[in-house]
Structure formats: structure tokens, C-alpha cells
Amino acid sequence: MPSKRTRLIAGNWKMNNDLNEAKDLAQALVAALPEIPEGVEVCVCPPTVDLRVVSCKGGVKESPIKLGAQNVYWEASGAYTGETSVAMLKSVPVEYCIIGHSERRDYFKETDEDENKKAKALIAGGIVP
């Protein structure tokens, strides 16, 4: 008998919301979704600079809403200005990460090979791509 699949509803906030707006939006979502049906996961993916405030108490920390990142770099550390490692995301903590987004491919010319490296790094680090 096939296993029941979990449905994922993810909100990609893209490059929107300052710190206060991100916290307010997280609080509004938590208030609107005190319970999530079985077989469904809800995830929010704010900009990297907002991950910590959204993850805290008063954000999604004590709610059924999961936290995701919008991007990751596959190297563990190094001179990669502006990039975020898997370990950095785990410390927030992040459970999901968007990869292979059409905007990353179009604007930053990311390739299948790049996305494969990201996926492998995320899986090795315990984050769902």
C-alpha cells in the first residue's frame, strides 16, 4: 500500500519585508494557523536577514509553521561573500530550503550542476531541499 504523501504549502517572501514587517507577518500567520491538518506542512521562507526574527518566540518557534530559507551555498565556509552555508541555516534552525528557483536560474545563471551541489549539501546537513 502506498504511503500517504505530506503536502507542503510554502510561502516564499522573496525580497520583501523589513525586520519589523517580517515579525508582524510571522505573528499574523501563527495567529491564523494555530493548527495545521494532519498530512500538511506549512513553511515560510523569509529573506535570510529575517530568518532569526521569524524563528524566535513571537515568530514561528512555538507554532506548527516550519521555517525555510530561500537559498544556500554548497561550500561549508570560505571567501564566498553574501552566501549562506548549510551550517548557518541549521543554527537558525531552518528545516527547508528553496533551490532551483527560476529566478536564481534566470538572474544568476545557476545550473543543474549548481542545484545538485546545493541539494547534496542540504541533504547531508539535514535540511530538506
Name what the model sees in each region:
Residues 1-129:
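Active-site loop-to-helix "anion-binding N-cap" substructures in soluble metabolic enzymes
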